Amino acid sequence: MNTVCAELKSIRTVTDLCIFLRVAGLACALFLGSLTVHAQEITWPQFRGPDSNPVGAHARLADRWSKTENVEWSLEIPGRGWSSPIVTGGKVFVTTATTEGKSKPPQIGTEYSNEYVAELQKQGLSMDQILERVTARDIELPKEVKLHYFLYCLNLTSGKVEWQKEFYTGQPPGGRHRKNSFVSESPVTDGKFVYVYVANLGLWAFDMQGKPAWNTPLEANPIYLDFGTGSSPALIGNLLVIVNDNEKQQYIAAFDKQMGKQVWRTNRDIGGKGQPVQRSGWSTPFVWRHALRTEVVTIGPGEAISYDLAGKELWRLSGMAATPIPMPFAYGGLLYIDGGRGRPLFAIRPGAAGDISLGKDESSNAYIIWSQARAGTYLPSPVAYQGGVYVLTETGILSRYDAKTGTMTYKTRIDPAAAAFTTSPWIYNDKLFCLSEEGQTFVIATGEKFQLLHVNDLDDMSLASPALVGERLLIRTEHRLYSIRRQRLAAGAGTPSTK
C-alpha cells in the first residue's frame, strides 16, 4: 500500500512538473513575443518606418498636441534638412546642413515655379531668360553657398544631444529648389551602425557612439533644373541600396554595409521613347519581401522597375509621372505604386515578370489587380490601414480607396484653409494624421466616411515625415524636433519638459 501511495505521489509530482513546465514555457514564449513586439515598436530604422507603411501600434500614442501640450521634449536643430528622424536602441538620428552666409528661405505652398514660368512666358521672354529668372528667384546654386553637413544623435527619452558629427564641409554637389533642402535623404540603420546618404556626394557609416566606420565618395551628377535630391537609401541584409536618377546616367547600386565597397551597379535608362525628357527622380526604393522572393521596387521618370538582389531587372511598369516622388509600399499581400501627380494608383500582385504595363483602356491585367486613373499624388506617399488606402495630394485633397478592389469610398478637401502638404500621412488608433506645411496636423477618423476630428498646431513649417516609436511621435519642423508623448497623470507631476 505504501508503495502504491509513493508511486501515485510520484506521478502527481511529475504531472505537476509537466504542467509547470508547459505554463512556464508558454509564459516565456509570450514574454519573448512581447519583447519582439516591443523591439519593433521602439525601432524606426528608415524613412516611413520598418514596413514603409507608417502605422503605429501603441495604444498610448497621443492624438492631441501643440507647442506645449503633450510635448515630452523639443530641441532646436541648427540649419535645415527635410530628412526624417530615425530611431534605434534609444537613440534618435537626424541630419541637417548649415549654410555660411545667407540662404534662400523655403517657401510654403503649391507654386513650384510652374506658375512663375507661365507668367514669364506670357511676357514673351525667351527660354533662356525664363530660366535665368527662375534660377535667380527659386534656385540656390552650389557656387552660392558653403555647407556644413551634420549627423546628430539624440537620447530618445530626454532629447539631449549625445553626439554630433560634421561629416562634410564644402560646396554641395548640386543646387536646390528653395522648396527642397541640401539634405533631404533620410539615414537608415541596422541597429549597429547608422548609414548616411547624400545623393551625388557620398555614403557614410557611423557606429552608435559616433565613430566613423567608412566613407564612400560618389560622383556628382546633374539634377533637373538643380532642384536638389531626396531619394533615401534602403538596407537589405548586408547590402545598402541607393537609386540615383539624374540627367547624366541613372543607376541603382548596392554597397557592402560593412566596408562601403560597391557590390553591384545597374545603369538605368528610364522612360525610353515617348517618355519624359527629364531623367531625374526623387522616389525612395522599397524592399518588397513576399512569399515568392525579395525584390527592390523603384519608381523613375515615366516607369517603375523592380530588381532582384543582384541588380537584375525583374519587371517594369509604364505610366509614372515625369517627376516621381512617392514611395511604393506593400499591404495585405499587394504592392501599391503611386504613379505621381495626374497618374494612376496601382495595386500589384507578387511574382510579376517582364513588361506589365497596361494596354489602352485597360485598368488591370495578370499582375495589376486594379488601378485608379489620376489617383496619384505629387509629394505625399499613401498609407494603408484596415482595408483602406488613403491618398493625400499636395493641395489637401484626401481620398480613400478599398485596398482590394480600388473602389473609391470618398474624396474631399481636408480644409480650405490648409495651404499645402508635403509630409506623408500616418495612422494609429483609428486616426489618420495629415501634417500641413504650416505645421497643422489634421486628425481624421479612419473608415469609409470622412470625419475631421480636430487640428493640432506647432506653428512652424513642416516638410519632413515623422517617426512613430512606441508611445512617442517624433515630428520635425523647420526649426525643431518634437517628441510628442501623452502625458502620464501622476501625483505631483508637472508639465512635460521642453529642452
Regions found by a protein language model. Give the residues of each.
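Generic low-polarity alpha-helical segments
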Residues: 1-3, 24, 166, 328
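Bacterial N-terminal signal peptides
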Residues: 18-34
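N-terminal secretory signal peptides that target proteins for export/translocation
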Residues: 1-20
